[in-house]
């Protein structure tokens, strides 16, 4: 077969024979195929040669270059846009409105057929005669001359050329007898005479069927040891011999394999990438159409990995990705396919399952494996994996639909936060659309001054005194009104808006404090929650100090709240940052104490001032003795470390009295007050009637 591109543009026309393993196409002079047009990108497309196990050759066209950069216009084949497309004879490639490229696979022998894409296949004429030719490096083998007409001198010269050619040449008859080997063959393949027809170069080259064409040239690739050879097998017409010409293509194969690896594998994890995954998924779906088994697509993400990357750098995050790969690879089956999808997400194709329950059990086992700490330089790091799941045939029957729906399922888990995994559901489509709209509105909310701060009082019930407030963000949407924090806090994290919004919270709360300063005690403090992304931002400390200075707020008025899970992500880095914050006089509080998986020994390590007992322990304290016992132990522990203790979620006086009897002094919750707007908290302070909460 002859493979070629016929380029047709207003400025030039050209025919390019395809012989190499890879071609880059674009307007930049460094490309293999240069098309000097401003309408296309500098590196618009890449053409890759592939040879399957049957030695059939095909060419794939990929949008952009092999480093993942896409073209401006895209690559359009037969009127449809494609990222990666296997070309068949007659395909029309459009790089812009006025540049078309025709792909042709032209038989070089009358018996050859044009094969390929089934319904996609179109037969088109060879257009090369109408265009100027590129320089072709090709040897044409025509009908043999009558050697009897050559002189003895010419015959001697011809024999010498063959005998001393650096390229091996072998001749056999149709009975498998070796009739000629040149010197190069004997040197490169010393065992060929001994192995005879069992030698890789001679195996299967004698036609077995009577209807084999009487004259044709066949090409195949042969691997011998670690070497690759291209063998051209010539069956001359009306001849009793078969001749082979052998060329060493090892270097070319190494380059091809390298290019294939770069195009379809992730260099960090050595896993297949998204392009190869989509190809393999398409093949699996085409083979499973008439089977009763269920396929599962599992998209895995990690809540803290991006923050870890920001805090500790790419090298640590890369090391964690490698460990994740090792763990996942050790727990997937041979028939399953694991790939790195993008960034910190992985995708898994689970095959041959009987039902959704079997897939769910498999996913739960994987997530349990990922809960174990990751040790980097002997320091434990904890990540929380989560997964979206879509299945064939329940949730879709083609590649694009399944990938779209597994992505929607993953976003659902990410937004909810409390779940580790979920299957795709039809209702998620509308939820996904709402999420996109909400995300768009969030980008405008900060500019339009739509965020508000509310404050929940913290009361010392022993003295009946207001000792601080916790700042809580709210969003006043122009259409939907007051939006629940549960609907947008997660989106602030995933979009990265939490960083500028977090700065706005501090700046606004510090400004509001100056309105209250005359009415509060000297130890009154403002508690502000930090998200994982904020805490792991490399410029957190200078940002806080700058805003404190700009607001003229003494550092001891600020109490930074972080959760146990944030503390545990990187012990050494956390300790360094907390020590730095405390050295500037900033107070530190561990939120949701008792709900995570930290070691109690870390209370001795980290310089916290306050522990906050989570509402999950306080809500049933009147009816659950075990909760009361846990809280009493926390209070004893906190007092032993000279820590301030705050109980959250106090909704009625009996709760408060029970906690006070156990030794807790500071509390917050709806019994004292709902979160109050800036105007309401100002009035609350002015009223000053906190003695009604005194239990001492």
UniProtKB/Swiss-Prot annotation:
Q: Which residues form the EAL domain?
A: 435-689
Listed InterPro entries: Cyclic-di-GMP_PDE-like (IPR050706), EAL_dom (IPR001633), EAL_sf (IPR035919), FHA_dom (IPR000253), GGDEF_dom (IPR000160), Nucleotide_cyclase (IPR029787), Rev_trsase/Diguanyl_cyclase (IPR043128), SMAD_FHA_dom_sf (IPR008984)
| A Pfam family of this chain | EAL
A single GO CC term for this protein reads: plasma membrane
Q: Which organism is it from?
A: Synechocystis sp. (strain ATCC 27184 / PCC 6803 / Kazusa)
Signal peptide positions on this chain: none
| Molecular functions (GO terms) | cyclic-guanylate-specific phosphodiesterase activity
Q: What is this protein called?
A: Uncharacterized protein sll1895
Please list the residue ranges annotated as the GGDEF domain.
Answer: 293-426
The organism's place on the tree of life at top rank? Bacteria
């Amino acid at each position: 077969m002859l493979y070629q591109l016929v380029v047709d543009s207003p400025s030039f026309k050209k025919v390019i024979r395809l012989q190499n393993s890879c071609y880059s196409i674009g307007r930049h002079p460094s490309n293999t195929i240069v098309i000097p047009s401003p309408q296309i990108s500098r590196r618009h497309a890449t053409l890759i040669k592939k040879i399957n196990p049957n030695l059939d050759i095909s060419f794939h066209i990929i949008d952009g270059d092999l480093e993942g950069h896409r073209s401006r216009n895209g690559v359009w084949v037969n009127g449809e846009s494609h990222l990666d497309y296997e070309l068949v004879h007659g395909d029309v490639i459009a790089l812009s409105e006025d540049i078309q490229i025709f792909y042709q696979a032209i038989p070089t022998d009358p018996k050859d057929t044009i094969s390929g894409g089934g319904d996609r296949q179109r037969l088109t004429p060879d257009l090369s005669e109408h265009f100027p030719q590129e320089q072709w490096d090709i040897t044409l083998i025509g009908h043999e001359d009558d050697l009897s007409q050559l002189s003895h001198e010419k015959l001697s010269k011809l024999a010498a050329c063959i005998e001393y050619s650096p390229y091996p040449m072998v001749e056999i008859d149709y009975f498998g007898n070796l009739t000629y080997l040149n010197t190069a063959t004997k040197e490169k393949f010393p065992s060929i005479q001994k192995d005879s027809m069992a030698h890789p170069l001679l195996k299967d080259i004698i036609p077995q069927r009577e209807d084999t064409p009487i004259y044709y040239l066949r090409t195949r690739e042969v691997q011998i040891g670690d070497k690759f050879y291209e063998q051209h097998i010539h069956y001359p017409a009306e001849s009793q011999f078969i001749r082979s010409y052998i060329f060493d293509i090892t270097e070319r194969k190494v380059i091809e394999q390298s290019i294939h690896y770069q195009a379809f594998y992730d260099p960090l994890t050595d896993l297949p990438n998204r392009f190869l995954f989509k190809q393999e998924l398409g093949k699996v779906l085409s083979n499973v159409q008439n089977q009763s088994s269920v396929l599962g697509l599992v998209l895995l993400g990690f809540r803290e990995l991006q923050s870890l990357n920001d805090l500790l750098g790419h090298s640590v995050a890369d090391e964690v990705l490698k460990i994740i790969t090792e763990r996942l690879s050790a727990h997937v089956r041979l028939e399953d396919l694991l790939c790195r999808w993008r960034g910190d997400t992985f995708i898994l194709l689970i095959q041959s399952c009987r039902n959704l329950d079997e897939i769910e059990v498999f996913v739960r086992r994987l997530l349990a494996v990922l809960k174990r700490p990751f040790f980097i330089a002997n320091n434990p790091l904890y990540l929380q994996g989560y997964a979206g799941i879509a299945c064939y045939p329940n949730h879709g029957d083609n590649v694009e639909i399944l990938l779209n729906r597994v992505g929607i399922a993953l976003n659902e888990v990410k937004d909810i936060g409390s779940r580790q995994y979920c299957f795709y559901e039809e209702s998620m489509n509308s939820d996904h659309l709402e999420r996109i709209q909400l995300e768009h509105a969030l980008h405008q909310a900060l500019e339009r001054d739509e965020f508000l701060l509310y404050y929940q009082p913290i009361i010392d019930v022993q003295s009946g005194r207001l000792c601080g407030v916790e700042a809580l963000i709210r969003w006043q949407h122009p259409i939907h009104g007051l939006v629940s924090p549960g609907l947008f806090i997660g989106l602030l994290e995933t979009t990265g808006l939490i960083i500028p919004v977090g700065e706005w919270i501090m700046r606004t709360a510090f400004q509001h404090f100056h309105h209250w300063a005359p009415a509060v005690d000297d130890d009154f403090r403002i508690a502000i929650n930090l998200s994982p992304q904020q805490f792991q931002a490399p410029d957190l400390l200078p940002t806080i100090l700058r805003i404190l200075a700009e607001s003229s707020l003494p550092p001891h008025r600020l109490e930074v709240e972080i959760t146990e899970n944030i503390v545990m992500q990187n012990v050494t880095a956390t300790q360094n940052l907390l020590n730095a914050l405390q050295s500037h006089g900033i107070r530190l509080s561990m939120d949701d104490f008792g709900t995570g998986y930290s070691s109690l020994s870390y209370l001795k390590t980290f310089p916290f001032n306050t522990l906050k007992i989570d509402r999950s322990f306080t809500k049933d304290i009147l009816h659950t003795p075990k909760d009361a016992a846990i809280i009493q132990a926390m209070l004893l522990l906190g007092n032993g470390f000279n820590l301030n203790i705050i109980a959250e979620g106090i909704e009625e006086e009996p709760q408060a009295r029970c906690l006070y009897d156990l030794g807790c002094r500071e509390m917050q919750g709806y019994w004292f007050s709902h979160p109050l707007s800036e105007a309401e908290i100002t009035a609350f302070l002015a009223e000053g009637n906190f003695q009604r909460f005194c239990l001492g």
